[in-house]
């Protein structure tokens, strides 16, 4: 059987970090995920999905994500239930995240922004190292059209 959920969306609120009685960090947040179709008014609707993440990833989510951040979530769907104060059974469906991808840099964190800028500079061929050796050019930069590769050239 398979229970796998992959989502990309924006946080609707800042993550909430707490620690269980056994000392495990848990973060929760809601992800707004646009539907692939439009409604009768031509507007795209969204689903608001509760996400739970544990341990070190919970700390990272709390540190680097905030309301409006774009994130990718890979996890599994889980339904739990409890009895509320009125004695009614309440069912809650949420995604238990195995992996969270931060899909954009956090602007309020200068360190993260600096890292992003370094990555951008490196992709433009500017070295961050002080040895001033030239960066080798991309050997495929001037390739026009498809590259012919024989099956015998492949290592697998």
Swiss-Prot record:
- Residues annotated as domain SSB: 1-104
Q: Which domain of life is it from?
A: Bacteria
PROSITE patterns recorded: SSB
- One GO molecular-function entry: single-stranded DNA binding
> Is DNA-binding tagged as a keyword?
yes
Q: Could you provide one GO biological process annotation from this protein's UniProt record?
A: DNA replication
> Which Pfam families does the entry link to?
SSB
This chain belongs to the protein called Single-stranded DNA-binding protein
The primary gene name is ssb
């Amino acid at each position: 059987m398979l229970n796998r959920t992959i989502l990309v969306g924006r946080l609707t609120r800042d993550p909430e970090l707490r620690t269980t009685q056994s000392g495990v960090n848990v973060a929760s947040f809601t992800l707004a995920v646009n539907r692939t179709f439009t409604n009768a008014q031509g507007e795209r609707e969204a689903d608001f999905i509760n996400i739970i993440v544990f341990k070190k990833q919970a700390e990272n989510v709390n540190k680097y994500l905030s309301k409006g951040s774009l994130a990718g979530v890979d996890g599994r769907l889980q339904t739990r239930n409890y009895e509320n104060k009125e004695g009614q059974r309440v069912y809650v469906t949420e995604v238990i995240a195995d992996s969270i991808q931060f899909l954009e840099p956090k602007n309020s964190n200068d360190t993260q922004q600096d890292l992003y800028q370094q990555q951008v500079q490196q992709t433009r061929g500017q070295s961050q190292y002080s040895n001033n050796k030239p960066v080798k050019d991309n050997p495929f930069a001037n390739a026009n059209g498809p590259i012919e590769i024989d099956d015998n050239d492949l290592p697998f």
